[in-house]
Amino acid sequence: MASEIHMPGPVCLTENTKGHLVVNSEALEILSAITQPVVVVAIVGLYRTGKSYLMNKLAGKNKGFPLGCTVKSETKGIWMWCVPHPSKPNHTLILLDTEGLGDMEKSDPKSDSWIFALAVLLSSSFVYNSMGTINHQALEQLHYVTELTELIRAKSCPRPDEVEDSSEFVSFFPDFIWTVRDFTLELKLDGHPITEDEYLENALKLISGKNPQIQNSNKPREWIRHFFPKQKCFVFDRPINDKKLLLHVEEVREDQLDSNFQMQSENFCSYIFTHAKTKTLREGILVTGNRLGMLVETYLDAINSGATPCLENAMAVLAQCENSAAVQRAANHYSQQMAQQVRFPTDTLQELLDVHAVCEREAIAVFMEYSFKDKSQEFQKKLVDTMEKKKEDFVLQNEEASAKYCQAELKRLSELLTESISRGTFFVPGGHNIYLEAKKKIEQDYTLVPRKGVKADEVLQSFLQSQVVIEESILQSDKALTAGEKAIAAKQAKKEAAEKEQELLRQKQKEQQQMMEAQERSFQENIAQLKKKMERERENYMRELRKMLSHKMKVLEELLTEGFKEIFESLNEEINRLKEQIEAAENEEPSVFSQILDVAGSIFIAALPGAAKLVDLGMKILSSLCNRLRNPGKKIIS
C-alpha cells in the first residue's frame, strides 16, 4: 500500500514566469510519490475573498496557504497541499489554491483565464468563491466559464457530425461548488425559506429577453448548468466583526469566531470530505498523484506552445507513460513471486510451470489494473514477450541447478568406483560382473537421491556414456568370459544404452509438450483477462453516456419549465444524438470476442520462441487457441 503523504505546508504547483506557465519540479516530485487515487479540490475566485482560509480549514490547519491582509493578492499561480484524506482510506486529498482573479497588477489578463481552465481540468470538485450575494455582478465576474469552450477541448479532432466539442464537457468536468462569503441576505424566495442549493438554482435561472446584454448575462448561467454535472452552494456569515481581528483571522481562536460561521465552515468541510469525488478521467480512469502530475505537465506544454489543452491528447500521453510503467510493474511482480515460490531445482518441469502459471496470472492482473487505453495491445504484447523471456530464464536456472546438483551427487556416489578403476580392481577374471554390480549400485543409490530435478536422467546418461570405454576395456580383459559371452555382454550394454537414449528423448518430447501447453494456457489467461477488461471498459463507457444523458435531460426539463425554446431545441438535438449513440452501442453485436481473437493471434505468434515461429506451427497453435476459446471444455492440443 502506498505510504501517506504528510506535507507540512503548501508548495507552488504552477507559476507565471515571463509570460509562461511553469510547473514547479518540487511539486511534481511530491505528486510522483503519490500512487493512491486522489480527490482534488480547487478553489478559484476574485483576490481578497478569503479563498485560502477555506483551503486551510480543509487541510485541518489555521495557517498554510497565505491569507494576506492587504488589497494585494497573496497567492500567485496555483499552490498545492497534499494531505491524507480524512474519510476515504488509501486516498490523498489534494488542495489547489489559485491566484486571485482580477488582480489589476497582472501584466497578462489571459493568465486568469488559464488558471481558471487549469483548475477545472485538474479538480474533481471546483469551488468558486465570491463575496456578498449571487447577483448580476457576481455572474458577470464569472465570465471565465464562457471562455472554457475556447480554452479546453475534449477531442483532438473536430467531430464529423459537427457537434460542439463542449457537449462532452459534462463527462469529465468537476462538480461546481459556489461559496458565498459575508452573506447578509435571508435565505427566502417569495416569502418562503429556501436552502442554499435552491438559492443557487434560482440565481442560475435564465433571464427572458432577446437583447445581447441579457443573452451575455445568461451565458455563465447556461454553461454552469450544462458543463458541470452537479452544482452546490454554501453561504457564510462574516467570520468576525472586529476589523482588526479579521485582518489576521488565521490567528483568531475558534471560540472568537461567529458561531454561525463556525457551523457553516464545518458543514462545508464535512461535505467536501464525504461528497467530493475521486478524480477520474473519461471512462472512469482513476487519477493518482503521479498521473495528476503528468496531466499538469501535458496541459502546460499545450498552453505554452499556443495549443488548446485537450483531454484526449493528455490521456494519450498519460497512457504511454502509465502503460510502460504497468509492464515493468507486472514484470517485477512476476520475477519477485517466482523467486519467492520456486526452490531450485524443481522435481519436474511441470512443477515449475505450475508456479509460473500462478505468478503469470497475478502479473497479468497487475498489468490490467494499472494500464488503460492500450488499444492495439502494444503494451500487453511487450508484457507477454517479457514474461516469456523471464520464464525461459527460470527454466534455464532450473536446469542449471539440477545439472549441478546431479553431477555433484553422482561424483560423490561414484568415488569408490573411480578409485577401484584406478587401482585395477576390475581388471581380473570375473571383474566385469563385479564392475556391473558396482555401477548398478550407483544407479540405484542415485535413484534414491531426492529432488534431483529435470536434468537427472540426462546427467545420469552422460555419466553412463563416460563409462562405455572403461566397461569395454574391463569386458575385453575379463578372462573368465568366453568370446561369445563377451559379445552378448557388449550387445546388452548397447541395448541398454539405446533404451536410455530413447527414454531421454521421450522425456525431452514430454517437456516440449509441457512448454507448448504452458504457452497455450498463458495466452488463454491473457485473453481471458483482456476480455474482462474490455467488458469493464465498455460498461464504463455506457455508464458515462447514460450519466451525460441524465444530466442533459434534467437541464432540458428545467429549460422547458423556464420557457427557453431556442436553447431547449438545441439541447434536444444533442440529447437525440446521444440517445442514438447509446442505442447503437447497446445494439452493437459484441465484437469484443472477435477483437480479442485478432489480438490474441498477433500476440501469440509474435511471442512464440525460436523455431516455433514457423508459419505452419504458429497457425496450428493459433487455430488450437481459437478452438479452445470457442469450446472451453474441450482439450485441443494433444
Swiss-Prot record:
Residues 311-638 are annotated as: Interaction with the CYBA-CYBB complex. It holds the Pfam family GBP. Induction: Up-regulated in response to influenza virus A infection. It is an enzyme of class 3 (hydrolase). It catalyses: GTP + H2O = GDP + phosphate + H(+); GDP + H2O = GMP + phosphate + H(+). InterPro entries: G_GB1_RHD3_dom (IPR030386), GBP_C (IPR037684), Guanylate-bd/ATL_C (IPR003191), Guanylate-bd_C_sf (IPR036543), Guanylate-bd_N (IPR015894), P-loop_NTPase (IPR027417). GTP binds at residues 45-52, 67-69, 97-101. Residues 590-638 are annotated as: C-terminal tail. One of its GO terms (cellular component) is cytoplasmic vesicle. Residues 35-277 form the GB1/RHD3-type G domain. Interferon (IFN)-inducible GTPase that plays important roles in innate immunity against a diverse range of bacterial, viral and protozoan pathogens. Hydrolyzes GTP to GMP in two consecutive cleavage reactions and predominantly uses GTP and not GDP or GMP as the substrate. Following infection, recruited to the pathogen-containing vacuoles or vacuole-escaped bacteria and acts as a positive regulator of inflammasome assembly by promoting the release of inflammasome ligands from bacteria. Acts by promoting lysis of pathogen-containing vacuoles, releasing pathogens into the cytosol. Belongs to the TRAFAC class dynamin-like GTPase superfamily. GB1/RHD3 GTPase family. GB1 subfamily. PANTHER family: GUANYLATE BINDING PROTEIN (PTHR10751). This is Guanylate-binding protein 7. It comes from Homo sapiens (Human). The lineage of its organism: Eukaryota, Metazoa, Chordata, Craniata, Vertebrata.
